[in-house]
Regions:
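ATP-dependent phospho-/nucleotidyl transfer catalytic cores
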Residues: 507
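Accessory carbohydrate-recognition regions in carbohydrate-active enzymes
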Residues: 24-383, 387, 391-435, 441-502, ...
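Bacterial N-terminal signal peptides that target proteins for export
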Residues: 1-10
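Bacterial N-terminal signal peptides
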Residues: 9-18
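Sec/Tat signal peptide C-region and signal peptidase I cleavage site
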Residues: 19-23
Length: 601
């Protein structure tokens, strides 16, 4: 009898567990904290699929208690899980990149006496919670619960205060970006607008661009005003101001304020315990007018925070739900859906609700699209698998991305390599737009201007190096079939010639397929032949690809393992000869033959 009761209990438990598991949505299986440690450079912020806006906890500055500080080492993310000093929410951030950028427009809630120095107003925190489209945290110093959610182009934050005086701060002087310069203007007691300069991504000092914002608070403040960090003065000059080298509060100034380290504060006296103040922000990369339009279009004035949060969650369930996973452990499903979640962050929207967007490499000029314009084309990172996934599962979005890429060619004469908000950073190597576009075409995604795309691809594959923005080292590639050591980088420790050539081989192999599909037989044969030039790099002695000197001799001495753990490896970028030797996906059988047959391969 006891055994029967036990079996019945187990059966009921299994039924309940199965019902609970089946009731889970794809968003329930996402853990946004995955990838936020060990230099994963992900973050747990609130964002929608491919959203322009993200609201990210900023915890990488201001305290020696942090394990990682953005200014103390190479650092490229606004958040690290092991850090414990919170200095606000950043609006607009990159995920998974290797260079610091964006992560600015920092909002913060505080209580008690007003202070605007982030080293002083920052706080420890606890009780972090994150799910797709939502993030919350409890701020220890202030007893404030901070929550954030987002729409495609705007954000909503909700701060639950204890009894007393509370403040909302907007810090425009700090952020992850290495650029400085901002402007803020009071529109009304509850609304401000302005702009912040961003850019200088991956050592590209001239690749800068503005982000525009409109910010509103839900409650009329008791007071408000600007702040600015004053320059350090010496001697008699210093006697003229009590704020020498410190943050100065402007309580009687009502026009716009500009500077490298400026901000705005709202104060709320007499808050009841549990009273909430909400902050809404719209952004644009075109204008403050468009930032306001984005905010008004995506958030009704009386839209509850929880309704916006639920809308974001619904969007994620629709996007993640295009793939249904069965079987496997719960942890495996969580890993899968979190990876899919991360795959749907970039490229992201740059066009506003009215279709306007910044033209490619034409600073200050604006275009209009009747669809969506995308940005953050980190194509060296994504050309091999991300866009193939989008083509198969999200063809509607991939189609708009293809149109965005061909639009960039029409606007400045080249397809993107590593494009960031209308600026080409030329980060990494190769001609990675080609395999992305060709793969989509060959899979049947054809609702874009393929003739224009082919024109762009052929241009980068044939233009001499001196005029070639995509392949500046193409001359020896065409003449010799390979790129010799020292041609593009005189310092061999920084030479990546083999990596460059391998990217071109893959691009030309893809281009030959498209040429054949479009009936350009001569081009198809030409680019196919070029794609097989990798064989010149093969060294029977090492059994790997090996860098070549201009005279055709192999680099010697040579260690095919050099490059492990980011050590210097002449000829190779972020990898070793063993890593790169197998990077000929267009001719695997040919590589196996070079190596002595399939068994040895």
């Amino acid at each position: 009898m006891r055994l029967r009761r036990t079996l019945l209990t187990l059966a009921l438990a299994a039924a309940v567990f199965g019902a609970a598991a089946s009731a889970q949505t794809p968003a329930d299986r996402v853990d946004p904290f995955i990838g936020t440690t060990n230099f994963g450079t992900a973050n747990p912020g609130a964002v929608t699929p491919h959203g322009m806006m993200s609201v990210v906890p900023f915890n990488v500055m201001g305290s020696e208690e942090n394990v990682y500080d953005k200014d103390a080492r190479w650092w490229s993310t606004p958040y690290e899980y092991h850090n414990k000093f919170f200095t606000g929410f950043a609006h607009g951030a990159l995920s998974g990149v290797g260079c610091p950028e964006l992560g600015a427009l920092l909002t913060m809630a505080t209580t008690g006496p007003l202070t605007v120095d982030y080293r002083e107003y920052g706080t420890s925190y606890r009780d972090e919670k994150a799910s797709p489209g939502y993030y919350s945290v409890f701020l220890d110093k202030y007893g404030v619960l901070a929550e954030a959610t987002a729409t495609a182009r705007s954000s909503a934050e909700r701060y639950t205060f204890p009894e007393g005086t509370g403040h909302i701060l907007l810090n425009l002087g700090e952020g992850l970006t290495n650029e400085s310069g901002a402007m803020v203007r009071r529109v009304s007691a509850t609304e401000i607008e302005g702009t912040k300069l961003l850019g200088t991504f991956c050592y590209n000092a001239q690749k800068v661009f503005p982000v525009y914002f409109v910010l509103r608070v839900s409650k009329t403040p008791s007071a408000g005003g600007y702040w600015k960090k004053q320059r350090k003065m010496t001697g008699v000059e210093a006697e003229w101001t009590p704020d020498n080298g410190r943050y100065k509060l402007y309580t009687e100034y009502g026009r716009e304020l500009s500077g490298d380290d400026v901000g705005y504060w709202f104060s709320f006296d007499g808050l009841a315990a549990g009273e909430q103040v909400e902050v809404r922000m719209g952004i644009s990369y075109v204008s403050t007018e468009n930032a306001r339009k984005n905010l008004d279009a995506e958030q009704a004035a009386d839209a509850p925070f929880d309704a916006i949060r639920e809308q974001a969650r619904k969007g994620w369930n629709e996007a993640l739900g295009r793939i249904r996973v069965e079987g496997g452990a719960e942890q495996q499903q969580r890993v899968f859906y979190t990876a899919l979640y991360h795959a749907l962050l970039h490229p992201n929207l740059v066009s506003d609700v009215n279709g306007e967007y910044p033209l490619m490499e034409r600073s200050g000029e604006t275009g209009v699209t009747d669809g969506e314009r995308y940005t953050v084309f980190s194509l060296w990172d994504t050309c091999r698998n991300l866009h193939q996934l989008l083509t198969l599962v999200y063809p509607d979005r991939q189609r708009e991305m293809l149109r965005s890429m061909t639009g960039m060619y029409e606007e400045w004469g080249w397809l993107p390599k590593w494009e960031l908000y209308g600026r080409e950073t030329f980060t990494m190597e190769g001609d990675p737009a080609i395999p992305v576009i060709v793969d989509s075409w060959m899979k049947g995604l054809r609702d874009f201007d393929v003739a224009k795309a082919y024109e762009a691809m052929r241009k980068s594959a044939t233009t001499p190096g001196a005029q070639n923005r995509m392949r500046p080292d193409i001359d020896p590639y065409i003449e010799k079939g390979y790129i010799p050591l020292g041609f593009y980088a005189k310092d061999l420790a920084g030479d990546t010639s083999v990596s460059h050539a391998l990217e071109y081989y893959m691009a030309d192999a893809a281009l030959s397929l498209l040429a054949d599909s479009l009936g350009h037989g001569d081009d198809a044969r030409l680019f196919r032949a070029r794609s097989l030039g990798y064989k010149r790099y093969y060294s029977p002695e090492s059994g790997t690809l090996r860098p070549l000197h201009p005279d055709g001799t192999f680099l010697s001495p040579f260690d095919p393992k050099a490059g492990e753990n980011f050590t210097a490896a002449p000829g190779f970028h972020e990898g070793s000869a063993w890593n790169y030797t197998f990077y000929v996906p267009h001719d695997v059988e040919g590589l196996a033959k070079l190596m002595g047959g399939r068994r040895k391969f």
